[in-house]
Curated annotation (Swiss-Prot):
Other remarks in the entry: The N-terminal region like those of many plant virus capsid proteins is highly basic. It has been suggested that these regions may be involved in protein-RNA interaction.
Keywords: Capsid protein, T=3 icosahedral capsid protein, Virion
Protein name: Major capsid protein
Assigned protein family: Belongs to the luteoviruses capsid protein family.
Length: 189
């Protein structure tokens, strides 16, 4: 037995070790690097426009409340107001309204909403076509085709109103989280 283990040990000692050689990579001639393309178009357009995302919270409001959220120079959103003061023309191209319910499980009713591009309607005139249940969350997204048909709006004129009317009780129903995208053109100097 000892001879067998000794012979294996001798074989291991006699085995030549492998040598690994790593060849260096061939160097490529350096070419002059070009400036990277700007892929994100937001922030500065070809026609001198500028794009800004905005967000705000509206509420809380009761289940029987009616209200108007204005989008333009008379908006409650400071981001919109500040940017409109710096530019001559604007257009809101995208809007998302998320209704966050704070109502109890026993509350009844719904919240009706409407986008008014004429900026003349009252919240009490909202028809119960588009609604959210007062007890559950909901969201609605509006594109350029719904938000207005003019290419650009003067910065002293509202583009549209978001009207809502509740059919619930006097308890707190919830609030809105509103986000959107506004394009601005012709900076005021």
């Amino acid at each position: 037995m000892p001879t067998r283990s000794r012979s294996k040990a001798n074989q291991r000692r006699r085995r030549p070790r492998r040598v690994v050689v790593v060849a260096p990579s061939m160097a490529q001639p350096r070419t002059q690097s070009r400036r990277p393309r700007r892929r994100n178009k937001r922030g500065g357009g070809l026609n001198g426009s500028h794009t800004v995302d905005f967000s705000m919270v509206h509420g809380p409001f009761n289940g029987n409340a009616t209200g108007t959220v204005k989008f333009g120079p008379s908006s409650d959103c400071q981001c919109i107001k500040g940017n409109l003061a710096a530019y001559q023309k604007y257009r809101i191209v995208w809007l998302k309204v998320v209704y966050q319910s704070e109502a109890a499980a026993t509350d009844r009713g719904c919240i009706a909403y409407h986008v008014d591009t004429s900026t003349t309607k009252k919240a009490a005139d909202v028809v119960l076509l588009d609604t959210w249940n007062i007890r559950s969350n909901g969201s609605a997204t509006f594109g350029r085709e719904i938000l207005g048909d003019q290419p650009w709006y003067e910065s002293n004129k509202d583009q549209f109103f978001f009207l809502y009317r509740g059919t619930g009780g006097t308890d707190v129903a919830g609030h809105y989280r509103i986000s959107g995208r506004i394009q601005l053109m012709n900076a005021s100097l």
